[in-house]
Amino acid sequence: VMNSPATHIARDASNSSALQLLARLGFAVNGLLHILIGSIAITVAIGAGSGSADQSGALAQLASSPGGVFLLWTVVVGMFALGLWLVVSAFVMQDEPKRKWARRLANIAKAIVYIALGVTALTFARGGTSSSAGSTQSASSSLLSSPGGVIVLFLAGVAVLGVGGYFTYKGAAQKFRSDLAVPGGSAGRAVIALGVVGYVAKGIALAVAAILVGVAAVTNDASKSTGLDGALKALAALPFGTSALILIGVGLMAYGLYCFIRARRARL
């Protein structure tokens, strides 16, 4: 019910300048993480590094940098705030019922991803470590050893493939333009170019990760499911894989730059 007390509270929260400012911080730190993931992917591709080309690798790189603890706590606050803003805004959006519920579910799914990333960042900020690839393998192993787990894992792969497809479509069709106020002239063209390249690259990376999850399910081998890091390194092992990984690394960095621009110009 749109006029319920809970809806009024949610609307007031979503319009809160403090929460909106923190959500913009969330977009910015998400951009920083993608720039780091992209740079790690490129160093792995050219054989100059061996870090994890995923969120854990990016957080580990932050942890080892000057002022790393402060940066990690900034990531924690930004990710939690962005997750909270997505949940709150899900309940005040206006649209026709079917589309509204689809958008609500999408917002809540994204919120879960950001909050989970915030929890991982919190682990690093408190001096711990975490491995996205290891967590993915562990979760896959648990599923494969449970009744019906193969089907659940395969469906998880299909879901991730769907997300990858959505990112690719959103980039290629420039559907992201409604998310932010695109400036005019050459600056606007640059923002659109970053969005197209960034979303398509992220979509391809997620699609490769999804295929590995599917392979793990079909072969009943959890070691095949290694998340984004494993997906990018598997890509590097293919013919022309080094070039492909460099291009995806550049694309992920483009997505990171787009996130920085979105932090400034997002429609909240």
Model-derived segments and their meaning:
Residues 152-163, 232-268:
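Alpha-helical transmembrane segments and their immediate juxtamembrane interface regions
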Residues 2-80, 263:
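An N-terminus-focused feature that recognizes amino-terminal "leader" regions
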Residues 17-34, 101-114, 193-204:
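Alpha-helical transmembrane segments and their helix-start/interface "positive-inside/aromatic belt" motifs
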Residues 17-18, 36, 40, 67-173:
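Hydrophobic, ordered structural segments
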Residues 118-134, 203-221:
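Alpha-helical transmembrane segments and their membrane-interface junctions
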Residues 56-62, 138-143, 222-243:
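Short, membrane-exposed interhelical loops at transmembrane-helix boundaries
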Residues 46-57, 128-138, 177-180, 220-229:
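Peri-membrane helix termini and adjoining interfacial loops of integral membrane proteins
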Residues 176-192:
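Juxtamembrane inter-helical linkers in multi-pass membrane proteins
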